[in-house]
Amino acid sequence: LENTEGSMSAQEIPLKLDGRISSYLQAYEQEDEELGRFVRLQSSCKGKLLIQKEIQQGLLHLYENGARTYFLCGETGSGKKLQCGLLCEAKKLPVLYVDSVRLMEQREPSDQICRRIKREAILKGNAAICFTGLPGDEEDRVDAQKTEKLLHGMRDWNGLLFFTSIYEWNRSIEGERKVVKVRIPDNTTEDRILLWDACLQEELRPADLNLIYLADKYRLTAGTIIDCVEEYQDRLLMKGAQPNMADLLAACTDQLEHRLGRDAVRIEAKYR
């Protein structure tokens, strides 16, 4: 893959490896008021996958210096998804892998796809999204417009964004070098509140807000709460039913009591 012209400078991050393996991460960084901070990572390895610990250290270095959008470049099988997973593991962030090819093949409108992806991201908290490639003809205007709409819809999303191909970023609509502008804000409490408020009517179901509330109240992840609800519904022979707030509270209370080994959790009456 060729460098983007002009505005990017290369910075090589040395990795301490044994003599049998030659590997490196190379980061191309750009900071722009409209784009935010992003990097392009390119990995090269002779014979073996990159050593996980060294990759993780390199990615953390970039993350701690403000990078929030990543382009993971390399040949098929070069460990691009592994690189994405390593950073998320180090920062204890859940990652949502999105198959861009399948998204483009679906007849579902781009705005609906964006709503679904953002809903997943909000439920996961400060999560990461990894787009796994987008092949095709650059001259396909319809596909390019759909791609632009999809990426523009991610502008208000909080978290980390990964692309496994620089091609997704450089697809042009007008002119030769027009890029899709996506800004990924830092995941502050204020940003999250504004995001929840903006998405409340259109992108979040009431049960989703219950999960967000419970995840904060009980310090449980949304996935753990969902597991609690499914177990609770199984006991009541209500599998598949939309859980209400009382079900959610009861399920979480049961889970916490189980963890504590005693009846140590009290729920105020107004929450039942």
Where are these regions (language model features)?
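A short, conserved structural fragment
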Residues: 1-7
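Conserved AAA+/SF3 P-loop NTPase catalytic/coupling segment centered on the Walker-B
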Residues: 123-150
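AAA+ P-loop ATPase motor domain of ring mechanoenzymes
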Residues: 9-107, 112-119, 125, 133, ...
